[in-house]
């Protein structure tokens, strides 16, 4: 396992995930009967700061259809949590207009690179072009100065 599992922290994430799903109207319990489901949800809502009891609740009451989705969500959250500790792994987001994203995604696909790798490559290409233009401008000025001195 690449990232250490922190039971207390992850129980809090699981609790938040389940409460969010419940508020969005998803069935988070394994019970078909509404009163049993509501009773289990009410119990869950009281367990926010009790990680061991949250895990027990999950084992006893959670809808089996949510198991894999919750695992994926927690795995992604764990990765983001640990990556945020180091500057070089910390992720940043930018807002792009759809057309810009579409062009960038197409270019990345054609180059066989990720969006981040494509952006870095475009920046490097622009920097190289700028450096080349500056060098040519400098050479042109030097050449004009040499030709001007010889007259």
Swiss-Prot record:
One Pfam family cited in the UniProt record for this chain: MatP_C
Entry keyword set: Cell cycle, Cell division, Cytoplasm, DNA-binding
Protein name: Macrodomain Ter protein
UniProt entry tagged with the keyword Cell cycle: yes
Family: Belongs to the MatP family.
InterPro entries registered for this protein in UniProt: Arc_rbn_hlx_hlx (IPR013321), MatP (IPR009390), MatP_C (IPR035375), MatP_N (IPR035087), MatP_N_sf (IPR038339)
Function: Required for spatial organization of the terminus region of the chromosome (Ter macrodomain) during the cell cycle. Prevents early segregation of duplicated Ter macrodomains during cell division. Binds specifically to matS, which is a 13 bp signature motif repeated within the Ter macrodomain.
Biological process terms in GO annotation: cell division; regulation of DNA-templated transcription
Oligomer and partners: Homodimer.
Location in the cell: Cytoplasm
Gene name of the record: matP
Gene Ontology molecular-function annotations: sequence-specific DNA binding
Principal location class: cytoplasm
């Amino acid at each position: 396992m690449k990232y250490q599992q922190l039971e207390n922290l992850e129980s809090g994430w699981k609790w938040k995930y389940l409460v969010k799903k419940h508020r969005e109207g998803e069935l988070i319990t394994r019970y078909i009967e509404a009163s049993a489901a509501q009773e289990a949800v009410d119990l869950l809502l009281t367990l926010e700061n009790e990680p061991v009891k949250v895990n027990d609740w999950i084992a006893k009451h959670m809808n089996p259809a949510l198991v894999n989705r919750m695992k994926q969500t927690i795995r992604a959250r764990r990765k983001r949590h640990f990556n945020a500790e180091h500057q070089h792994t910390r992720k940043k987001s930018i807002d792009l207009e759809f057309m810009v994203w579409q062009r960038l995604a197409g270019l990345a696909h054609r180059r066989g690179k990720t969006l981040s790798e494509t952006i870095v490559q475009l920046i490097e290409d622009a920097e190289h072009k700028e450096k080349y233009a500056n060098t040519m401008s400098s050479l042109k000025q030097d050449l004009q100065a040499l030709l001007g001195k010889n007259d």
